[in-house]
From Swiss-Prot:
GO terms for biological process: toxin catabolic process. It catalyses: RX + glutathione = an S-substituted glutathione + a halide anion + H(+). This is Glutathione S-transferase F4. It is an enzyme of class 2 (transferase). The gene is GSTF4. Belongs to the GST superfamily. Phi family.
Length: 245
């Protein structure tokens, strides 16, 4: 019995009931459409063609650090995801929840055919979170977010983190010589989790790190061209002017 069959055996009724409920009622997403973590969740919702209600949290005014938002996430960070009585924060936990509940709908974002494929998927999700994201997030902050707030980019930090990111991308280049995507030959949460920072960095000088590696460049071109991701980045359609459920 493979991993997916075991999960279904353990939670068959919960999963079916949960999926039906969400298709009817939709979800609530508290966040900011320009936030990398919020966009990560929106991308999964669009890949799964799911209904959701966007609720704007005004980061500029510090709304996320005050009540009532802190009652949703005591760490004061976006996004927060509401599914009835279930309230989740941490974007990667949210994406996995959605991908599992709706595993039979839309894009198959989990590779659970065997213990090995499940472990490989999990390994690459950890690599994204602990190897790629730290330097990528710092580079996004320095080159994209700070200028928005009128703050000066620290070029020393940029240089240091580009050097770290280069080492990560060298490993990615080698991996992508063997596989179309990072976890396997199909698009999964692993690739999706990279999208928010990559999208912002493509508008900065750091873009060169992705472009000078042929396999990485091809991978980036493919994942950033997905329709679900384009929708997640279109804040007018996916957030501000989105019809309420």
């Amino acid at each position: 019995m493979d991993c997916l069959q075991m999960v279904f055996k353990l939670f068959p009724n919960w999963k079916r009931e949960a999926e039906v409920k969400k298709l009817v009622a939709g979800y609530k997403v508290h966040g900011d459409p320009f936030s990398t973590n919020t966009r990560r969740v929106l991308a999964v919702l669009h890949e799964k063609r799911l209904s959701y209600e966007p609720i704007t949290v005004k980061l500029q005014t510090g709304e996320h650090k005050t009540e009532p938002f802190l009652s949703l996430n005591p760490f004061g960070q976006v996004p927060v995801f509401e599914d009835g009585s279930v309230k989740l924060y941490e974007s990667r936990a949210i994406t996995q929840y959605i991908a599992y509940v709706h595993s039979s709908r839309g894009t198959q974002l989990l590779n659970l055919r065997s213990h090995e494929t499940m472990a490989t998927l999990t390994m690459w999700m950890e690599i994204e979170a602990h190897q790629f994201d730290p330097p990528a997030s710092k580079l996004t902050w320095e080159q994209v977010i700070k200028p928005i707030y009128g703050l000066e980019t620290d070029q020393t930090i940029v240089k240091e983190n580009e050097a770290i990111l280069e080492k990560v991308l060298n490993i990615y280049e080698k991996r992508l010589e063997e596989s179309r995507f990072l976890a396997c030959n199909s698009f999964t949460l692993v690739d999706l989790h990279h999208l928010p920072n990559i999208q912002y960095l493509l508008g900065t000088p750091t873009k060169k790190l992705f472009e000078k590696r042929s396999k990485v460049r091809k991978w980036v071109d493919e994942i950033t061209s997905r329709e679900a991701w384009k929708m997640a980045c279109d804040q007018e359609k996916s957030w501000f002017n989105k019809p309420r459920n």
